[in-house]
Amino acid sequence: MMENLLIPPPPWVGRVDGTSSHHLRWHQAVTPLHDGAEPGACVLIGFSSDEGVERNKGRRGAARGPDALRGALSSMALAEPLRVYDAGTVAVTDNRLEAGQMALGSVVAATLDAGQFPVVLGGGHEVAYGTYLGLAQAAVRTPKRRIGILNLDAHFDLRSDPVPSSGTPFRQILEQEHASGTALQYSVLGISQPSNTTALFDTARGYDVRYLLDDDCSVSDRHRVAVFVSEFLSDVDLVYLTIDLDVLPAAVAPGVSAPAAYGVPAETIQFVCDAVAASGKLAVCDVAELNPSFDIDNRTARTAARLIHRIVTKRIPIAV
């Protein structure tokens, strides 16, 4: 029997300029998820964990990420009314990461099966395996639909560690897909060469991972980035978009476990998110590695919230 690790959502509060549709902000649109929530709505799911980060020898603090993201989203203005629910937060306690990932997968799958759009608020990048489990279990995934994972990240996260961590999720996913005899395309945009060993590049080649280095993702490289994303989208039917905030420059995203010495400009990341949201293929999204303990002026949380805002408000639903 699946253990229930879901805790209720916190209250959403923020600035109030009025109650008409012309004054709406996120906190006025979000309500707790209930059984009658309509298909097509966005459902926020928190994943409070930094167990995977610690196992990967990183800095603790990402467990506070979900509520920091909620806080940054709260007062963002909505151009038009939004259907959005908060399912609460899957909390990883007592080092029980694997149980938390399974619980998250169950919530994501239920959300997808209800015809809704899950957006998972991490948490370390160990969130990815839980998000994937949900998509893999959901009815929306059929044998004829190929899953594509687009990871915006400075790291491959393909480590072969003895226990699951924030550095292993995509290797776990690829191994599970291989064992099941199913096809999955894993692509990464923003890879930092100095942050990934030759062994990790070799592993990526072995799994036929497509990637674009951070050196090739500047604002002047827009065409190269557009081609990379377009080719990815053309080869898949369902997209899981995962954003590790350490893909951004440290000046923009200081509040992560491993701040980037170089990073991909926010303009490029926003462009990619917009393209994926408008593709009509985006099934699920998560945001990982926000560490409020190291954030400065909430820069990282605000940047992440802007990306979430654009993804949710610009997303074209998947055709049934």
UniProtKB/Swiss-Prot annotation:
It comes from the Bacteria. Pathway: Amino-acid degradation; L-histidine degradation into L-glutamate; L-glutamate from N-formimidoyl-L-glutamate (hydrolase route): step 1/1. InterPro entries: HutG, Ureohydrolase, Ureohydrolase_dom_sf, Ureohydrolase_Mn_BS. Mn(2+) 2 binds at residues 153, 155, 244, 246. Binds 2 manganese ions per subunit. Mn(2+) 1 binds at residues 125, 153, 157, 244. Its cofactor is Mn(2+). It catalyses: N-formimidoyl-L-glutamate + H2O = formamide + L-glutamate. Keywords: Histidine metabolism, Hydrolase, Manganese, Metal-binding. Its EC number is 3.5.3.8. PROSITE patterns: ARGINASE_1, ARGINASE_2. It holds the Pfam family Arginase. SUPFAM superfamilies: Arginase/deacetylase. GO terms for biological process: L-histidine catabolic process to glutamate and formamide; L-histidine catabolic process to glutamate and formate; putrescine biosynthetic process from arginine, via agmatine. GO terms for molecular function: agmatinase activity; formimidoylglutamase activity; manganese ion binding. CDD domains: Formimidoylglutamase (cd09988). Belongs to the arginase family. Catalyzes the conversion of N-formimidoyl-L-glutamate to L-glutamate and formamide. This is Formimidoylglutamase.
